[in-house]
Amino acid sequence: MTNIRKSHPLIKIVNESFIDLPTPSNISAWWNFGSLLGVCLILQILTGLFLAMYYTSDTSTAFSSVTHICRDVNYGWIIRYMHANGASMFFICLFMHVGRGMYYGSYTFMETWNIGILLLLTVMATAFMGYVLPWGQMSFWGATVITNLLSAIPYIGTNLVEWIWGGFSVDKATLTRFFAFHFILPFIISALAAVHLLFLHETGSNNPSGISSDSDKIPFHPYYTIKDILGLLIMLMMLMMLVLFSPDLLGDPDNYTPANPLNTPPHIKPEWYFLFAYAILRSIPNKLGGVLALVLSIMILAIAPLLHTSNQRGMMFRPLSQCLFWLLVADLLTLTWIGGQPVEHPFIAIGQLASILYFSIILILMPVFGTIENQLLKW
């Protein structure tokens, strides 16, 4: 009799994805982030579900309902802060995961990579809409500023913005629809994640060396299940330290003031995980140009496979490209810092330089360095 996990139609899928999956024997901790993202998604859906039981998506009661959750609902405060800071952990894992893909050349799995970009965009959209829901000052003005960017689209821009708002300003209709989208999108993300895995398992995982690992594979369970659980425990420990010791560390104090359309906060800025893109947007004086740069800062990932000139897949044996990669990381951290600063003298120039450097590294320097390394290897 065959084992039920190998014969049952449903259990067989789980078995082939998480138990008997042939996995390269040399993948490092950088390959942990996929499973961590899955855990983050489940955590966000569960905490979000409990928050949705008490939240009201009406402009007159939204702010009060969030206060009510924190003050009066049993353990409401911990659910709310786990959800808010869980989003930060989600993005930390996302950035690490994408960075790993860039470093080790995982973008050569085209289908997996493109679905990953789609996932990144969907998660960003979900997080943005979630930030609007508490209906604090930064929620309201963030929604106003970011949705207003669409008005830069020629001809249809203004109509598009009013269509998204459901009126002539961010109001009750906007909040209600954002709540509806914020509720449904995580389930769409789950479906996309399943497709992401489906395509990944067609090719098998990449590994740090970038060389085919067909000759040296081990079963996913118990080796990588244990390794993933270690990563999970570290992440949960970091999350709970954030939630229990400094839950408002990554938030904006302005969001504890109820939304007021008549009073603009001095510095409108999004959550920390969007600051790099926000800095790129602000560094271009033209509205349409800024919006295009904002979109390109993420969509540039889609052409990563076309910009790959090296004969080697990953950067493990390419010291020049490694220097460039870490320069890119430093540049993104600089952009994140600039995005949170006011628009005044030194910061404007730094932001513009960092934005130029960001696009230069990806579009020009990386392909050039790849070609140089190919030539050096011929010596």
Swiss-Prot record:
It is a multi-pass membrane protein. The chain crosses the membrane at residues 33-53, 77-98, 113-133, 178-198, 226-246, 288-308, 320-340, 347-367. GO terms for molecular function: metal ion binding; ubiquinol-cytochrome-c reductase activity. Changing Y54H: In strain: Isolate Nellis. Heme b b566 binds at H97, H196. InterPro entries: Cyt_b/b6_C (IPR005798), Cyt_b/b6_C_sf (IPR036150), Cyt_b/b6_N (IPR005797), Cytb/b6-like_sf (IPR027387), Cytochrome_b (IPR030689), Cytochrome_b_C_euk/bac (IPR048260), Cytochrome_b_N_euk/bac (IPR048259), Di-haem_cyt_TM (IPR016174). One of its GO terms (cellular component) is respiratory chain complex III. PANTHER family: CYTOCHROME B. Heme 1 (or BL or b562) is low-potential and absorbs at about 562 nm, and heme 2 (or BH or b566) is high-potential and absorbs at about 566 nm. Belongs to the cytochrome b family. This is Cytochrome b.
